[in-house]
A protein has these predicted regions:
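Generic secondary-structure signature for well-ordered alpha-helical cores
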Residues: 2, 6, 35, 64, ...
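Active-site-adjacent beta-strand anchor residues
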Residues: 23, 41-45, 172-173, 193-194
Length: 251
């Protein structure tokens, strides 16, 4: 995470505060669920490199179980550029993460699972989409975060909507740009609309954001999702406020 103290200018130097740590959408949700008193397990593909070891050590600190292949290569890495106003832009190197195949998924990794939360990214890349769809078949309840309007655009909004409709998730988390490009909420699904500083809409119930001094918005939506899964709307907004008041996406 690079928190800029001044705007970037081409060819110039800008003061910044940097932090290296674990993150990623599914990883953030798992860490926040554990922080908020729930039990969490992360299932994903990582590499036997420094970034992978950092991520696995972070999960251990939070009490999150980790399952999934550990292979040669690069663990997924993201550079989050945080502007002076706390808004963020990301540059992502997915590494080995999208290479997680369905035949590598051990059904035992979902034993005891009462709820599966999928990152939308995992449904828009191959072969990880096969692993995600297989995991969804094994889970009794499913939620999906739409993840990124630009990823939906590149994948194809109609194609992505059809995939979601086939999955029939109990809950979908989206921001306004993602909702717009998808063409609106899915019928028969609990829809949580993340509205940043305006708060969130939980179905037909709209609540304001919890006041916070914004340092970094990276991971705020993931904290909100975790809070909602653990305790509902109020814990969701409280977790998001905690997240934006710190540098970094995990608790």
């Amino acid at each position: 995470i690079v928190r800029l103290s001044q705007p970037l200018a081409e060819g110039a130097d800008a003061d910044a505060v940097t932090r290296l740590g674990a993150g990623g959408q599914a990883a953030n949700v798992a860490a926040w669920v554990a922080e908020l008193g729930g039990e969490a397990r992360f299932v994903g593909k990582t590499a036997d490199d420094e970034a992978g070891r950092t991520a696995r050590a972070a999960f251990e600190r939070y009490g999150v179980e980790v399952r999934g292949p550990v292979v040669a290569g690069r663990t997924g890495t993201v550079v989050s550029l945080v502007g002076v106003d706390g808004g963020r832009t990301m540059a992502s190197d997915r590494g080995v993460s999208p290479d997680f195949r369905a035949d590598e998924l051990d059904p035992a990794w979902l034993d005891g699972c009462t709820h599966l939360h999928l990152s939308g990214y995992s449904l828009m890349r191959s072969p990880i989409d096969g692993a995600a769809l297989r995991a969804a078949e094994l889970a009794p309840r499913l939620s999906v975060d739409l993840s990124s309007w630009s990823a939906i655009r590149d994948f194809g909004p109609e194609r992505f909507r059809e995939r979601l409709e086939a999955l029939r998730p109990a809950i979908v988390f989206a921001n306004e740009d993602e909702e717009r490009i998808l063409g609106g909420p899915l019928a028969g699904t609990e829809w949580v609309l993340k509205r940043g500083p305006l708060g969130a809409r939980f179905g037909d119930r709209e609540l304001p954001a919890v006041a916070a001094d914004v340092v970094d918005t990276t991971g705020a939506g993931d904290a909100l999702a975790a809070g909602y899964l653990v305790g509902g709307p109020e814990p969701a907004l409280e977790a998001a406020a905690r997240c934006v008041a710190q540098l970094g996406s995990m608790p």
